[in-house]
Amino acid sequence: MRTRVVFNQKGGVGKSSITVNLAAISAHQGLKTLVIDLDPQANSSQYLLGDDATYSADKPALEPNIENYFEDVLGAPQSKGLLGNAIGSLLKNRSKGLDGYVHQSPFKNLDVIPASPSLGALAHVLESKHKIYKLRDALQQLNGQYDRIFIDTPPAFNFFTLSALIAADRVLIPFDCDVFSKRALQTLIENVIETQDDHNDRLEIEGIVVNQFQAQAKLPREVVQQLKDEGLPVLESMLPPSIIMKESHHKNQPLIHLAAEHKLTQAYQLLFNEIEKK
């Protein structure tokens, strides 16, 4: 089982699109694949599960979800009843693995553990109770059930992102060719290296995924060359901009199912092949 985190502390760089489309290609190639959505915006969840995973003031988040899992990790009884009831609740929650929170997507071999908009509210209590390794332990129990796991993370270095990095083998870093993304990259890589040193020496930076790359424009080419000159692991397969991505989001269909021969789909295919060879 191979577990990848798609992570960037900067928002708007295509984390969810990259997560879902690589996962969809993985599943399309016959690999049993799971997407875990740790971003309260739930873009990956909605991309794959459509209206079922949308939420609003009048519509709660789809359950069970990743927030429910972390609530169960905390072991808080649902009621303030007798001690026996409390202990029974704790034992029941302890026995429940991550597979109890999985939803099947409409696509063969592709499952999802959806996010919840209120997930962030649990971060402080999870930190205070030292639950940072629980996701890693839960994923180890899934070994044999999935070939590939992709984790979408929030645009912040917080409890949930750190949990994902501790649980993963590899991290993919989406990158837009602008000065703000480049400035944020050093801090991001420092955080990953610190996680390697302190928590997870198995974790590898699989590469920087250049998204929205305009090959005809001078600035993107210069920025990418600067990254390479600095010795950063820029992946050769880059993702061009295309309006078809918006159509893919709107129809809740990953590119491999919506337009398999499109140039952006083919770019994703090349990217998947490149990272799988590592």
Tell what function each PLM region has.
Residues M1-K278:
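P-loop NTP-binding core
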